[in-house]
Structures are given as structure tokens and as C-alpha cells.
Amino acid sequence: YIPYLINPGLMWLTGINCAVFVVAAIQTFSAFYSAIFIYRIFREVIGVSRTDATLLTFFFFGFGYVMLSAMAPDHFIISMMLLLFALYVSGKLIKSRKKLTIWQSVVYFFITAGTSLNNGLKIYLSELFVNGWRILRPKFLFLAILLPAALTWGAARMSYRYIVWPREKAAKEA
């Protein structure tokens, strides 16, 4: 929604529709940080040499679907960046034998599930590996899993009711 709000401002300044440039900036940012996070996973979490980490990063981005998603205006590259970030942080926590806190879990879920809802499930799987079966304790289950899922569902319903539905209704009436 924020890029949508940036575009009218850029249109007012430049006189042209800058949506393509806004999307390109988001895609480039996401692809760049995906490369940074995958390199750090190879280097700091797995522990391979700098040369091997660099080669593996290039190899990863050599896959056709990764290259295509870095260029096509879709949410996949954004999801990949966020999930690689979560994988990096989870790997660092596992290596240092630390646990993921409730607030970290909530932030992870909101950011990743805000891009695509199935990413939230991947975050829960990550929490299972980092925290073990501790995620099934009532406090963690309610505050870190059920409450964020319910708030995300409520936000989705509100955005549909107050943003999408009025626009659809106005388009049908016109």
C-alpha cells in the first residue's frame, strides 16, 4: 500500500506514471538483499569458505526461476528475501543456542505473512526448529501464533471491507 501512495506523489512531481520504477526499485532491493542473506547463510551459518559461499550464491541465482522472479513484478522475490532473512536469523540463533522470543516471532509472522500468508506457516516451522516443542506451550502458542494469525485475518477483512469492496462496488455501478 505504501508504494501505491508513493506513486501519486511521483506522478505529481514528474507528470508520468512511475509505478514501473517503484516496482523496479522494490525488486532490485529485494534481489540484492536476497543475495546478501544467502551469502551470509552459506558463510556464517553453514561455515563454508568465502570462495565457496560466493560460488554457491551465484549458483543459486543461476537457477532460472530465481532469475525470472528477480525480474518479473511478482511477490516471490520479496518473499524470498524475507524468508532468507528469517532462515539466516534462525540459523544464527540455532548456532548460538538461543531461543526466538515471542516479540521476534510476532514481527517475523507479520512481515512475512503480510507478503504471502503461507510464509507465516514457514515462520512457524522455523520457530519449531529454533525453539523446539516450546512453541506449543500455552503462552507462546497464544501470543506468538494464534494472536498474530487472528490479527492478520482481521486486518485482511478490514482492508477488503474498507478498501477493496467500495472500489468494486463503485466500478460495478459505473
Annotated model-derived regions:
Residues 145-174:
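Aromatic-rich transmembrane-lumenal/periplasmic boundary elements in polytopic membrane proteins
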Residues 1-21, 173-174:
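Lumenal/periplasmic acceptor-binding loop at the mouth of the active site in multi-pass
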Residues 71-77:
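Short acidic/glycine- and proline-prone juxtamembrane loop motifs at membrane-interface regions
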Residues 78-95:
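Specific aromatic-rich, kink-prone transmembrane helix
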Residues 99-132, 143-148:
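Membrane-interface alpha helices of multi-pass inner-membrane proteins
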Residues 2-3, 7, 23-37, 79-82:
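Transmembrane alpha-helices of multi-pass, membrane-embedded glycan-processing enzymes
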Residues 38-62:
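Transmembrane-helix signature of polytopic, membrane-embedded enzymes
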Residues 43-51, 95-100, 129-140:
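Membrane-interface helix-boundary motifs at transmembrane edges
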